[in-house]
Each structure stands twice: as C-alpha cells, then as structure tokens.
C-alpha cells in the first residue's frame, strides 16, 4: 500500500454512532466520492465499514477499530480483538495506537505487532503516534510507517496542532525517523496538504475537512 499512496491523499471516511452519517453504506459512497475526487487511499473504522467500502472502490484501505475500554485511554485498535476484526476485513494496512499510554488489559504494543505479523505477514502496520519519542519506539518495534494522528489528542500534546510553526513536528519526525511519515490530524486545507507533501510526508490523511459536513458547516459559521 505504501507504494500506491506515495505523495497522495488518503481520505478518512468515518462516522461514529452519534454522528448523522453513521452507516456503512454511506461511508462506502463517501469513499466512492473520494476516489472520484482523486484520493489514492481510504482510512476507515470497523470491519463492517471496510468490507462495504472495498465492495464499492478498489482503493487500498487503512483499517482501524475505535472501541472504548474502561481501563485505558487507548481506543484505536487497542487489543487483539480489533486486530482479528481488521484481518477479517482484508484491509491492506492496519493502524494501531502506538502511544506510550497503558493499553487495555495491559497488552504490550510489541506483542500486538508480533501477533498481527504472525497471522498475516503481508498486512502493513501504521503507528498512530503523538510524539517523536513514540515514533522512534514504533520504528524499532517493526511498524511500516508512522502517522501523526494523535499529535494534539493526548494529555502531553494537548493544544498542539500539526501545522504549528510551519509543521515543525512533521519536520522533526522526517529528520529523525527513517520509515515513511504520514501526515494526519487537523489538515484543514488543500494548501496544508500540499505543504506536508512538499516537506517530505509520504502521504497525507484528511478526514473531517472533507467527510464531516457538520464540522465544515461550523467552520463557515465560526
């Protein structure tokens, strides 16, 4: 998948249960619209959505399962259960929360990586990180790429945005980590997307700015 998405846009097609567009059918059509617009990949949540999206478009999919656990703040592909579901979906890449926070059931990140590779050595793994330290750890653990997904969404990075100081966080990752870096999170405009690619990001994931009409509407109203 990494070869297919080089210098390209990945559109995140997700709607949680409390959102108006929550529906596997609707997400499949959102993915089709994204493909027609030029997207080269899709990021999607849940086995059901991914299966329906793959029936609609022939784009590679980054799969996640968001699920809350009482004993952890980690909710993106947090345990073996989510890995099993994503492997059943046949997505090309699986994204896993790779922050240093404690995982549900005290599962170790290395064990989750090893488990996935043991069951399917072909599936690629994306590390959703918040800090440079986490990116370096993920690289050593055997992830295929890094995504800035959680930068600004953890207690130690709150109020940070990927675009701060002309994408200084992205620049630091690119200079310190050898595996591909995917820019994701608060990329709100075509200009931001182009800047990320210009700086050297392997690809860029955009979600809310394209696929969440309620957020787009709020931005217009201010």
From Swiss-Prot:
Keywords: Carbohydrate metabolism, Isomerase. Pathway: Amino-sugar metabolism; N-acetylneuraminate degradation; D-fructose 6-phosphate from N-acetylneuraminate: step 3/5. The keyword Cytoplasm does not apply. Gene3D superfamilies: Aldolase class I. It comes from the Bacteria. One of its GO terms (cellular component) is cytosol. GO terms for biological process: carbohydrate metabolic process; N-acetylmannosamine catabolic process; N-acetylneuraminate catabolic process. It is an enzyme of class 5 (isomerase). One of its GO terms (molecular function) is N-acylglucosamine-6-phosphate 2-epimerase activity. Its EC number is 5.1.3.9. It catalyses: an N-acyl-D-glucosamine 6-phosphate = an N-acyl-D-mannosamine 6-phosphate. The keyword Isomerase applies. Coiled coil: none annotated. Converts N-acetylmannosamine-6-phosphate (ManNAc-6-P) to N-acetylglucosamine-6-phosphate (GlcNAc-6-P). HAMAP family: ManNAc6P_epimer. Belongs to the NanE family. This is Putative N-acetylmannosamine-6-phosphate 2-epimerase. It comes from Oceanobacillus iheyensis (strain DSM 14371 / CIP 107618 / JCM 11309 / KCTC 3954 / HTE831). The gene is nanE.
């Amino acid at each position: 998948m990494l070869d297919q998405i080089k210098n390209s846009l990945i559109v995140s097609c997700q709607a949680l249960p409390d959102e108006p567009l929550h529906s596997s059918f609707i997400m499949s059509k959102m993915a089709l619209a994204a493909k027609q617009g030029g997207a080269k990949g899709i990021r999607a949540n849940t086995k059901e959505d991914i299966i329906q999206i793959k029936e609609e478009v022939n784009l590679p999919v980054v799969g996640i399962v968001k699920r809350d656990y009482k004993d952890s703040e980690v909710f993106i592909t947090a345990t073996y259960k989510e890995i099993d579901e994503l492997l059943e979906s046949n997505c090309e890449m699986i994204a896993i929360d790779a922050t240093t926070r404690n995982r549900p059931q005290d599962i170790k990140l290395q064990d989750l990586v090893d488990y996935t590779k043991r069951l399917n050595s072909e599936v690629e793994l994306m590390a959703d990180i918040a800090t440079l330290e986490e990116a370096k750890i993920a690289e050593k653990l055997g992830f295929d790429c890094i995504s800035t997904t959680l930068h600004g969404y953890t207690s130690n990075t709150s109020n940070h945005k990927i675009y701060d100081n002309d994408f200084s966080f992205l620049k630091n990752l690119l200079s310190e980590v050898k595996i591909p870096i995917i820019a994701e999170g608060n990329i709100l405009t075509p200009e931001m997307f182009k800047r990320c690619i210009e700086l050297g990001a392997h690809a860029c994931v955009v979600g809310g700015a394209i696929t969440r009409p309620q957020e787009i509407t709020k931005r217009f109203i201010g």
